[in-house]
A protein has these predicted regions:
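Sec-dependent signal peptide recognition
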Residues: 1-9
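Mature catalytic core of soluble alpha/beta enzymes
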Residues: 4, 15-332
Length: 332
């Protein structure tokens, strides 16, 4: 289960730019969260309607909270023909799963439900290793049967795209805007974002990422600030989403290799890459993997990913790891 950290756009744009494009701002609700979009548009044309229509289409494909969606029907045991959006999300999820050795898995839904993370019904959770072992038999993308674009799930297998769907939504909105000739934009959905070109002042979009703590003064809220151009960014963290039962802290990130909530020293992971769907999924996978394994993966993907990690050492003190490419992007 991915949990985003709030992001803040530091550069406030003027109402118009030197090339007579006008700044348009769209916002709304989607997927249980909010979206905020800014873009430079000739004559100030707004694409709010098209954006909302696209988000509705995405919900109809991959939202587990819409009973009529493709993913919900699959989870109910129907054999159903998928659409382009579903296929895009699924194969991006599989790609990240393969690159991380299975630490990202879109079939973790039974585990998420067991641990009470869907409806925050954590008081009913009884930690039972035997029960978890049984559930684990229903986890794994290999338990999906594909024939052309028709899919059926093995008995008990359930899909959950929550850790990648918002990133995919960002990518699809970006595609929509570019098809309309918009080449300067900042798109944010639930904390995942993508930036292209410049803002109305002709400057690169500048982003602040919050410190992974609820006890930080607003003036000191940012862990780091970076310039973002023609890239996507996603941040995952567990400091806001967890519960304590019998003295044990259970974070909302599930480790699909063990069936248990991730137990490691990571506080937050920020990933920058070309596609927001991949940034979204990798950030979640790295939160499950822990620092050592994440650093090993990054070495193999250093031409694809930029990473900023906040973690604690054995004394509980905050430490950071920044990949070489990410260091060049940070401005504070």
């Amino acid at each position: 289960m991915k949990n985003f950290l709030y992001l803040f756009v530091l550069v406030l744009c003027a109402c118009s730019s030197s090339d007579n494009k006008i700044l348009v701002a769209n916002s709304g609700e989607t997927q249980g969260t909010y979206y905020h979009i800014k873009y430079l548009s000739p004559q100030g044309e707004s694409f709010q309607f098209q954006i909302d229509s696209l988000l509705t289409e995405i919900d109809s494909s991959v939202s587990i909270y819409k009973p009529y969606s493709i993913i919900s029907k699959l989870n109910d045991g129907e054999e159903i023909k998928t659409d382009e959006i579903f296929n895009l999300v699924y194969f991006d999820a599989v790609h990240v799963g393969e690159n991380t050795g299975g630490y990202f898995d879109c079939t973790v839904s039974p585990l998420v439900k067991y641990w009470g993370f869907y409806n925050n019904d954590t008081n009913e959770v009884k930690v039972d290793s035997v029960a978890i072992e049984t559930i684990m038999k229903k986890v794994g993308v290999g338990k999906m049967i594909w024939e052309d674009s028709t899919v059926v799930l093995a008995e008990g297998v359930k899909l959950d795209f929550n850790a990648i769907a918002q990133g995919t939504s960002v990518d699809l909105i970006a595609m929509l805007l570019e098809e309309k000739g918009i080449l300067n934009y900042l798109i944010e959905v639930g904390g995942e974002l993508k930036a292209k070109g410049v803002n109305a002042d002709g400057n690169i979009w500048r982003i602040g990422v919050d410190k992974p703590s609820e006890e930080i003064d607003f003036k000191e809220r940012f862990q780091f600030i970076l310039d973002l151009k023609d890239k996507a960014l996603a941040t995952s963290g567990n400091y806001r989403k967890f519960y304590v039962k019998d003295g044990v802290k259970y974070a909302h990130t599930i480790n699909p290799k063990t069936g248990f909530p991730a137990q490691n020293r990571l506080l937050s992971v920020t990933v920058v890459t070309n596609k927001c769907s991949l940034a979204d999924a990798y950030a979640t996978a790295f939160m499950a993997m822990g620092l050592k394994k994440t650093k090993q993966i990054i070495k193999t993907l250093d031409d694809e990913l930029e990473v900023y990690i906040v973690y604690t050492d054995n004394n509980g003190d905050w430490k950071i790891y920044i990949s070489p490419a990410m260091k060049k992007r940070i401005v504070n």
